[in-house]
Amino acid sequence: MEGSKLAAAILGEVRRAVVGKDEVLAKVLLAILAGGHILLEDIPGVGKTTMALAFSKALSLRYNRVQFTPDVMPSDITGFTLYNKEAGRMEYQPGAVLCNLFLADELNRATSRTQSALLEAMEEGQVTVDGVSHPVPQPFLVIATQNPAGASGTQLLPDSQMDRFMEIGRASCRE
């Protein structure tokens, strides 16, 4: 299928779930095709999460979603090792980020330590747990949503994390 027809088909599928945000949908698709991670910022209840899930379905990507809150731990994102008594050894239990599309919902509600757990996966395409690196599946994409800074329970994302996102700001999400 020709590139423009494929893009139109993907956008058509996403529009079945997200209505009235054509400019934002086009920007998100361009960011995905460019291989970038995406940050969607807007007030609660305008469809940021629905949009991210619609893209994962339209692109047939295996996705995981974490609703970030202050009690989410870095190991929820990266995974952890656990002793397997039957096997007599430690075994890696994959975290939520080991998927094709990771939806980091309300990322700016998590602690800085948990937010930082995403950095290695976003920058290097792997997570390291107990000194062992585990590659993330390819393609790999993070779509993060956040509420505006200053909203109750939110904090600013560090510059080192912001640098890894293509930001689609709140003005364009409000159409």
Place the predicted regions along the sequence by residue:
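P-loop (Walker A) phosphate-binding loop of NTP-binding proteins
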Residues: 43, 77, 145
